[in-house]
């Protein structure tokens, strides 16, 4: 992890000395953690603003469409940050891989391939694709192990068949996988919702929690899968924040 600055340890003072606790400088937050905090806080604010009411999630410019929500909270925060390897390159988040390029898998399990040199600060931390050569149980075991890789700040992209529908969904994990409860916590928009006069309205969620088996059962289906995208460790503060790129 690339820290902005780290406090030096008080090597010569006993750990139980009260004076040491008062004098020891605090460890400053890393730029990467600050970026993740900003993304999560922006999502929380949108959740609070929605106040439990469904938000329009129908049109390309609606930020409450699931993918748009995750892109929006990224763009609201990314101008302040860069990658140490490419300090002059503004950060960008890739679009989903087009349907034709997903074949033989179903649309929605992954993003387009955009290099770090082009501004993509994410890498694939884990990926699951249903393997028809294995049994359903074997696939489920792999899907569960995949879900155990979740860490705070991860972007989660899946192609699913589950209670809320069939197709692509995007979410952001707001905590590490919890092995004690076998759960993950996330935020998203439009996983649940309804249509009103032909227009889709979606629910904004923050600190939603489910056992990993719930998620695995959603995407552990033939042709489907999911990918965990994680911010690189070399996130730094930008020396001169650039204006955000306009929406396509």
Task: Outline where the language-model segments fall.
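Alpha-helix termini
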Residues: 80-83, 178-182, 217-227
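Boundary at the C-terminal end of the N-terminal hydrophobic targeting segment
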Residues: 5-7
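N-terminal capping segments
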Residues: 12-120
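...with weaker cross-activation on analogous glycine-rich loops/strands in unrelated enzymes
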Residues: 91-195
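Low-complexity, Gly/Ser/Thr/Pro-rich intrinsically disordered linker/tail segments
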Residues: 188-192, 198-248
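A detector of low-complexity, intrinsically disordered, Ser/Thr/Gly/Pro/Ala-rich segments
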Residues: 9-11, 181
